[in-house]
Amino acid sequence: MTNKKAFKEACKFIAGGVNSPVRAFANVQSEPKFISHGKGAYIFDIDGNSYIDYVQSWGPLLFGHCDKDIQKACQKALHKGSSFGAPTLLETELAKLVLSDFPHLEKIRFVSSGTEATMSAIRLARGFTKKDKILKFEGCYHGHSDSLLVSAGSGAATFNSPSSLGVLEDVAKHTLVAKYNDINSVKELFEKNKDIACVIIEPIAGNMGLVPAKQDFLEELAKICKNNQTLLIFDEVMSGYRASYLGSYGINHIQADIITFGKVIGGGLPAAAFASRAEIMDILSPLGGVYQAGTLSGNPLAMAAGIASLTKAKKKTKLYNKLGKLAKKLTQGMKKLADEKGLPLQACHVGSMFGYFFTKDPVSNYQDALKSDLALFSKFHKNMLENGIYLAPSQFETGFICSKMDDKIIDTTLEAVRESFKRI
């Protein structure tokens, strides 16, 4: 069966033919590749084509596809049982592994997805502060729970409307939206709203393309939260163990009240978490009145994969330095080639994460990102795919370097970039 036929058949039985919208390739006016298998830095589609994979399952695969250590850990766990709905030693082992490196985090709770982690963190913040409103930032994605599917309305200092059908206005009105990297927009919202339970932010935004928050912006944001008895939530579902071993904390050293984790923490299996100090976490059921639960939360397969992934990352002290150098080489190379061709391009990296925008101006927030030339991106994406390079099929996604990549792979990629730019 070909990719084209597979997608046509999938559309008959699966809504939209995919189980997550961006996979449909609609943003690049194309159709998805159906993947048969992956190995290291490569994936292979059912037509027999191979690609250097910079999506890496949208971030979890720090060690690439089919890592032997993670596979071995999963196989060992599977032989004992895939799920029990009861505590296991693996849960405590992974909890200790995560918490040992964050002095401000004392307890953790595992869930099965990033959406669950952020949704639960917000409920926890509301329960702890006894306040109703939440503040998020335009362009930051925190999963698809109702209160977070809200984008900016007519100005950041207003109540906002849902950005998805099915989200009630009564839910959306409790979500305030500020401008990323703009502390004045935050101050304005706090001046007009005294019942903000929490501020949730991607300290390294990866869902409007890669846009890191500025150090002084985060520092001032933390002060505002502290002065207003508002909890600060860092959503590190993507950046945790990706931007550095300690995520944004390893870079900006700012201690958020709650951190959400995901992707790498599950080693490629469905796992996520939220963590905080004990006084906050202890109001979760069964100790307190904030309810959160999950049938597959902390399942042994995901815990085993997470332990193997984080243990390996922690042991390989030079890993993040290597990944950062490769990401730097890639983004600087792309920028140089674009300049030579006279194409508008902004490119950056943070650790093993990288992003690029087809725009002439620097990008520091969502409105800047929206100025990107989407038609140009679509042509570039198609050309790269034809040259064996698998990039995220959206201008507003982040790319990832894995440990199985090397200078040769980056050189191959840059040659594909050169050829792709020639054809634009």
Curated annotation (Swiss-Prot):
Pathway: Porphyrin-containing compound metabolism; protoporphyrin-IX biosynthesis; 5-aminolevulinate from L-glutamyl-tRNA(Glu): step 2/2
Gene Ontology BP term (one): protoporphyrinogen IX biosynthetic process
Protein's recorded name: Glutamate-1-semialdehyde 2,1-aminomutase
Catalytic reaction annotation: (S)-4-amino-5-oxopentanoate = 5-aminolevulinate
Subcellular location: Cytoplasm
Gene3D superfamilies per the UniProt record, alphabetical: Aspartate Aminotransferase, domain 1, Type I PLP-dependent aspartate aminotransferase-like (Major domain)
Modified residues (N6-(pyridoxal phosphate)lysine): K263
Domain of life, per lineage: Bacteria
Molecular function per GO: glutamate-1-semialdehyde 2,1-aminomutase activity; pyridoxal phosphate binding; transaminase activity
EC class of the enzyme, as a word: isomerase
Gene name in the database record: hemL
Single GO cellular component term: cytoplasm
Organism name: Campylobacter jejuni subsp. jejuni serotype O:23/36 (strain 81-176)
Family: Belongs to the class-III pyridoxal-phosphate-dependent aminotransferase family. HemL subfamily.
Major localization class: cytoplasm
The keyword Isomerase is annotated on this UniProt entry: yes
InterPro entries in UniProt: 4pyrrol_synth_GluAld_NH2Trfase (IPR004639), Aminotrans_3 (IPR005814), Aminotrans_3_PPA_site (IPR049704), PyrdxlP-dep_Trfase (IPR015424), PyrdxlP-dep_Trfase_major (IPR015421), PyrdxlP-dep_Trfase_small (IPR015422)
Keyword Transmembrane: no
Family annotation (SUPFAM superfamilies): PLP-dependent transferases
Its EC number(s): 5.4.3.8
HAMAP family documented for this protein: HemL_aminotrans_3 (MF_00375)
Co-factor(s): pyridoxal 5'-phosphate
Binding partners and assembly: Homodimer.
Keywords on record: Cytoplasm, Isomerase, Porphyrin biosynthesis, Pyridoxal phosphate
